[in-house]
Amino acid sequence: MTDDNNTSAYGDTDADGSAPADSLASNESTATSLVEFSHSTIDVSRDESRERPRRPSFPTFEPENESFPWQALPETIRAAVIEICLNDKVAVPIAVQAVMSAVSLACQDLIWIDRGIGEKSVCSLYMLAVTDTGARKSRADSTVTSAVEAYDREKRAEHLGALEEARYSVKERQRNIVELEKDARAWRRQIRTLTIRDPESNENVIILAKAKLDEIEQELIELARQESLHRKPRLQRVLYSKIPIRQLEQSLAENWPSAGLFSDEAAGILNARGESDMSSLDKLWEGKAIDVVGRTARESFFIEDPRLTMSLMVQPIVFDRFLERKGELAKGIGFMSRVLLSRPDTPYGKRTVDTSVPRLTEWTELFNNRVRALLSHGHSDIALRSQGRKTLYFSQSAQQAWEKNFNEMERATADDGKLVYEREFVNRYGEHVARLAALFHFFERGKLDGASRADDATEREIPEATVTSAIRVVDWYLSEFKRVFNPEVAMREMALYVLKRLKQMLDERNNGQLLEPLGMGQDHSNCRVPYHELRARCSRYDLKKTAKFDQVVRWLEGRGNVAIREKDARHAGAGKQEPKSIEIKYTSKGHWRGGRQEYVFHFDL
């Protein structure tokens, strides 16, 4: 028996029909990542499994305090994520974004997803990680885009050859046109001369000359037709890194219209000129044509049947400024609801190096081979791209699960619902689930080149387990959206961040963990820090701005976590004042330990 969500059509079991020992053995500590999320199973015939290559053993992975549901990812994708995390000590959401962006890029031009509501959707993903520059996203990206870069290099070499061949063909055609026009003029002169001299005697010659002229003119018409139909060969480039949105659109129009934008510096994209660029990105996410009419012919272009995957990273301070300037615009026109956003913490202090431990590459190589195979399967003729696409659909139980989840989310957006502030994301929630489910299914089970039939339900029908997995993943991205756009959740997160910084400063001032208030009466100087020093320590969420910082500490004061002490004259007549400060509140436990009374400081919400 094999889990629908964790198997692939291109080799996922051992030669004897069983799953890899490390992944499906009775040892629960190793099997958890593969088995505990299994919702349904299918029989895999022993004959079929004998034809499949042996799969690598599955890596053991036990991340600390990880909220992302990485166990829900299908086998090959999950294993690639784990290898990246173990090799380079990156946060799970960073590895997931790198891997899923490569999956989206590889599959987006090959499939549709039919959600059962009368329309098909493209399957491209937009993903954005808000994290520090030390998050190693570029390293994670490079691990899984090596196959894409190799594909681009191959296509660039082919393009150079095609350009040279096209130049030769154009020159040859133009040379033929010149020669034929010269011949046509000569025949016309001869016909005219013969007609003037003695048309009756030269009748047969004139007829032959006219026939020859007609033949030449037909050749010229055909060459002119070929000239009018000639198009410069398109470069099948699929990977971009640093390019403005308008130039990206133009490149999609002039080169290949299915591509990916992978950038570690997304500030230029987020700070685009405004609603126009964001609206274009919205259309590209939906696979809609874009018609741009510029001031000149060079500035005018048309993108037909586009596909775009985006994997972006931006620093927290840049993202916070973007939210302040354009957050409501991006949310209102739907850009942010189309993005799968994550704000992972960089695991500082845990990214140690141990060269005695070999790097894990088996699953990553398997993943990259699959990406390369999918990219190579795309049609090289732009006019025939859409003909080879397969439409995936939900099984009956999967359709019911998707609809049930969709309706529950929709009801939660009512005025009294729990997702009022997340309405924009919920508007796209069902489509996010469908896209991820389709990518999970096709990447693991999709067949290439003559290996599938029109009625092959195993390939086209997405099982319930895969939809349930996609729901778990999208639920996590919904929680990340809440962290940014739900005022209560955002305030709570900012408050926890301020409390964390306050605790760090107090521990520094007390040469270790703050254990008890010191001082007489209510004056406990070891429990407070200067207001503006704490504000200067808070670099995230735009909290260095006094107005925003004050809003958060006032919220904490109202909850009883801190007290705000205004400037206070400490020495009468000396004119020396203690600056405005923030003091942590505390509660006595009412008992003693080791000759010291115990206290609980209110660093938690």
Language model features by range: what are they?
Residues 2-4, 10, 20-605:
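Phosphate-handling catalytic cores of nucleic-acid transaction enzymes
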Residues 13-15:
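Intrinsically disordered, low-complexity terminal segments enriched in Ser/Thr
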